[in-house]
Design a protein with these regions (language model features):
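Short, hydrophobic/aromatic beta-strand segments
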Residues: 186-190
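Conserved small/polar residues in nucleotide/adenosyl-binding loops
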Residues: 191-197
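Boundary at the C-terminal end of the N-terminal hydrophobic targeting segment
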Residues: 19-24
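Extended, loop-rich substrate-binding clefts of extracytoplasmic carbohydrate-active enzymes
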Residues: 106-171
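Positively charged n-region of N-terminal signal peptides that target proteins for export
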Residues: 1-4
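Bacterial N-terminal signal peptides
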Residues: 7-16
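Beta-strand-rich N-terminal accessory domains
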Residues: 25-106
Length: 198
């Protein structure tokens, strides 16, 4: 018993001293603290907003959820709000700036048993999304074979270590960046939609 405890302590100390080797991969092979893609995007919700000032979350796919304002935490709140892009002259050139909707959302949204879909899941979205978090920043990179551009969403909060006043400002930022990957000029229209709720 004592010997196995000492061995565990020694292994723990090695992991602390050499985190790059001891903690670089988990049992499924995803890199520790690396990028999230495919099924690893399904349950990510990165909080954005000032400390104690309400929040919304940037999901792994780029969707907005968990909108909690005015001291009312509401982690199931998914408003009718999304960014979209249209590329002129491209077939299938209009898409929501999000990755594919996770399967668990399609078959289990809140109150779906009451016949309330209240979702925008049927709109076309980008095929691939890659999420990476480096607090207080999170990025979602979007790609699609139909689109002659790549999109990047960067979400961040006003977090300044040792500065509680400025870190608690009621601010959350989403930046959208587009890169033309076609090699020729394209005409693009971007919009951010907020639709009324029922």
């Amino acid at each position: 018993m004592v010997r196995s405890t000492l061995t565990l302590l020694a292994l723990f100390n090695v992991a602390i001293l050499f985190p790059g080797k001891a903690m670089s991969q988990n049992s499924e092979g995803r890199e520790f603290n690396g990028k999230y893609q495919k099924e690893y995007l399904d349950k990510i919700a990165f909080p954005i907003g000032g400390i104690g000032a309400g929040m919304f979350c940037l999901e792994g796919t780029g969707a907005i959820s968990h909108v909690s304002l005015r001291h009312h935490p509401d982690v199931m709140n998914e408003p009718y709000t999304f960014a979209a892009i249209y590329v002129k002259g491209v077939e299938n050139g209009a898409k929501v700036l999000e990755g594919q909707v996770p399967t668990w959302k399609l078959f289990g949204p809140a109150q779906s048993g009451l016949g309330r879909g209240d979702k925008t899941y049927g709109l076309p979205r980008f095929e691939e999304a890659v999420f990476q978090a480096r607090f207080p920043f999170a990025t979602v990179d979007l790609k699609d074979k139909d689109m002659p551009l790549a999109a990047k969403i960067t979400g961040w909060s006003p977090f300044i270590p040792t500065d509680a006043d400025n870190s608690s400002l009621p601010v959350g930022v989403l930046e959208y960046q587009f890169t033309n990957t076609s090699g020729k000029a394209i005409a693009v229209s971007y919009t951010y939609l907020t639709l009324p709720t029922n």
